[in-house]
Amino acid sequence: KKFIDLVQLFASNIQKDANGDPCIFFNDKLAPVMAAKATYIEPLQNAGIKVILNVLGDHKGIGISNLTDDQIEKFAAILTYIVKEYGLDGIGFDDEYADYSTPIDPTSASKLVLKLREKFNAEFPGERKIIQMFQWNYASNISAAAGAEIDLADHGAFGPNVFQTSSAFAGVTNDRWCP
């Protein structure tokens, strides 16, 4: 029996391109892993371990909680391309370190989850790609519809609340919380 069944590549960063739209950045630690998927990613998958890419803020004023509808469409397309290009099993979101400079849209993270699920379903018919969410910052306010599309959720709680017994994300059932 496997001790580990999922690896999250930590972390890619959401940044802005020259037009202010979201793009993904692989830092100097992650880029070599992504470039050598046959060495690092595929052996894990061949052993039955799912591999997902984490998307984290990068102090650039943009994150999953302040995207416009147009940016959500573009970013979901980018993430779907990355999953296909690198043969990944899904995407994980972490709303830390965005340093939001534009107003927060409380529906942005929900819309992104729903759009990403739509694009995953279109690109990978019959295969459910993983969407993971870290319960932190503004992403804690996702809708029940978006929560229903999240496969794995991580508590953003530490200390005495680390073992919460109920879902803090609307639509996420207790069986989808990571241990």
Where would I find each of the regions flagged by the language model?
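Chitinase-like catalytic core of GlcNAc-active glycosidases
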Residues: 1-179
